[in-house]
């Protein structure tokens, strides 16, 4: 008899894409997949586009959003838990997988109240508030990076599920210093304003041949393209890169934020990187994500407070002339990557659906 999985993931690509990777793997094995999210975030379009039905609940974040929202939070949470329970009664999943996003909190509580096994996956090196709370209710807690939760019988490090086409990329190769440096700029699914503003001038000031592909985020393409044109730099600018595997394969160096999915894809792709973590990320989780590769010699760390035209230009110029260093960084990235994370998470879903408890796992 076919098993059913309910995936809870939304808000950003860092939550949605790993969930899709697991969903695709289980669907190929005969599972039925449903999704729980919110109607005003990216999962509302992205998940149906991948062929999965999605149900919505009404929920918003409560951290750092003012006293009125904080006071209204208990009512909203209770309402959203009841909505999630109705979804569970309709779908009757064998397992509920929480990948992060606003819907995960109420959905996780509803799963626990309904007696449905709850499996959590924490994508960041620092656990988010929702997963910290839900961990008490979950049968199993999976981590992308060590240290997000204390080691126990119920926890395991499995990596971040990344797109299979990224995992399938060949081993990194040394590029010739006589050729232009292939520079990929990735601001995450929502773009990164500081990269959009600083990189064009830095590329121009580097004083070395550089070819650029720049993912700028929705609504930013025209202004970023104009910034490159003003500096006399030819660049391929796009709001969203559909084929990230091709982009990583092309790149000698990536300059990017340090969201969980980006860090994991950089590692899986085997490409050198300069990480510029989002400075105001909750619990500074992007810095901790970045350090998992920086500490292994696979990437460089550039705090946003130190990011200037001159500082980035100097790094680009230095690395462009040291292709062996870039290759060593790329190889180190591939070495620390966990490339079968989607399979590991899918296997955990199957074990819970089969009735194995945390001690058996």
Swiss-Prot record:
GO terms for cellular component: plasma membrane. CDD domains: GT28_MurG. Pathway: Cell wall biogenesis; peptidoglycan biosynthesis. InterPro entries: GlcNAc_MurG (IPR006009), Glyco_trans_28_C (IPR007235), GlycoTrans_28_N (IPR004276). It is a peripheral membrane protein. GO terms for molecular function: UDP-N-acetyl-D-glucosamine:N-acetylmuramoyl-L-alanyl-D-glutamyl-meso-2,6-diaminopimelyl-D-alanyl-D-alanine-diphosphoundecaprenol 4-beta-N-acetylglucosaminlytransferase activity; undecaprenyldiphospho-muramoylpentapeptide beta-N-acetylglucosaminyltransferase activity. GO terms for biological process: carbohydrate metabolic process; cell division; cell wall organization; lipid glycosylation; peptidoglycan biosynthetic process; regulation of cell shape. Keywords: Cell cycle, Cell division, Cell inner membrane, Cell membrane, Cell shape, Cell wall biogenesis/degradation, Glycosyltransferase, Membrane, Peptidoglycan synthesis, Transferase. It is found in: Cell inner membrane. It is an enzyme of class 2 (transferase). UDP-N-acetyl-alpha-D-glucosamine binds at residues 12-14, 124, 163, 189, 241, 260-265, 286. It catalyses: di-trans,octa-cis-undecaprenyl diphospho-N-acetyl-alpha-D-muramoyl-L-alanyl-D-glutamyl-meso-2,6-diaminopimeloyl-D-alanyl-D-alanine + UDP-N-acetyl-alpha-D-glucosamine = di-trans,octa-cis-undecaprenyl diphospho-[N-acetyl-alpha-D-glucosaminyl-(1->4)]-N-acetyl-alpha-D-muramoyl-L-alanyl-D-glutamyl-meso-2,6-diaminopimeloyl-D-alanyl-D-alanine + UDP + H(+). It holds the Pfam family Glyco_transf_28. The keyword Kinase does not apply. Its EC number is 2.4.1.227. Belongs to the glycosyltransferase 28 family. MurG subfamily. NCBIfam families: murG. Cell wall formation. Catalyzes the transfer of a GlcNAc subunit on undecaprenyl-pyrophosphoryl-MurNAc-pentapeptide (lipid intermediate I) to form undecaprenyl-pyrophosphoryl-MurNAc-(pentapeptide)GlcNAc (lipid intermediate II). This is UDP-N-acetylglucosamine--N-acetylmuramyl-(pentapeptide) pyrophosphoryl-undecaprenol N-acetylglucosamine transferase. It comes from Aeromonas salmonicida (strain A449).
């Amino acid at each position: 008899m076919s098993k059913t999985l309910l995936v809870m993931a939304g808000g950003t690509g860092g939550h949605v894409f790993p969930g899709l990777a697991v969903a695709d793997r289980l669907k190929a094995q005969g599972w039925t997949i449903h999704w729980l999210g919110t109607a005003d975030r990216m999962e509302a379009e992205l998940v149906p586009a991948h062929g999965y039905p999605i149900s919505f609940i009404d929920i918003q974040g409560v951290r750092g959003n003012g006293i009125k929202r904080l006071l209204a939070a208990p009512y909203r949470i209770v309402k959203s838990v009841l909505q999630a329970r109705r979804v569970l009664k309709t779908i009757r999943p064998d397992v509920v997988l929480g990948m992060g996003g606003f819907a995960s909190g109420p959905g996780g509580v509803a799963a626990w109240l309904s007696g449905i096994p709850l499996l959590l996956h924490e994508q960041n090196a620092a656990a988010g508030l929702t997963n910290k709370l839900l961990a008490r209710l979950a049968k199993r807690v999976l981590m992308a990076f060590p240290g997000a939760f204390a080691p126990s019988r119920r926890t395991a490090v499995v990596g971040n599920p990344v797109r299979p086409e990224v995992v399938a990329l060949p081993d990194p190769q040394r590029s010739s210093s006589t050729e232009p440096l292939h520079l990929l700029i990735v601001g995450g699914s929502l773009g990164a304003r500081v990269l959009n503003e600083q990189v064009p001038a830095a590329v121009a000031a580097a004083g070395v041949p550089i070819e650029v592909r720049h993912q700028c985020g929705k609504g930013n393409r025209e202004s970023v393209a104009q910034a490159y044109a003003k500096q006399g730099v030819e660049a391929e600018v796009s709001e969203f890169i559909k084929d990230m595997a091709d982009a990583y394969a092309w790149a000698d160096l990536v300059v990017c934020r340090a969201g969980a999915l980006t860090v994991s894809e950089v590692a899986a792709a085997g490409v050198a990187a300069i990480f510029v973590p989002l400075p105001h990320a909750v619990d500074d989780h992007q810095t901790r994500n970045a350090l998992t590769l920086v500490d292994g010699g696979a990437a460089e760390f550039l705090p946003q407070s130190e990011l200037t035209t001159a500082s980035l230009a100097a790094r680009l110029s230095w690395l462009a002339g040291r292709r062996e260093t870039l290759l060593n960084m790329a190889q180190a990235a591939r070495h620390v990557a966990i490339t079968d994370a989607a399979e590991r998470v899918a296997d955990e879903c199957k074990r819970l659906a089969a009735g194995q408890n945390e001690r058996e796992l």
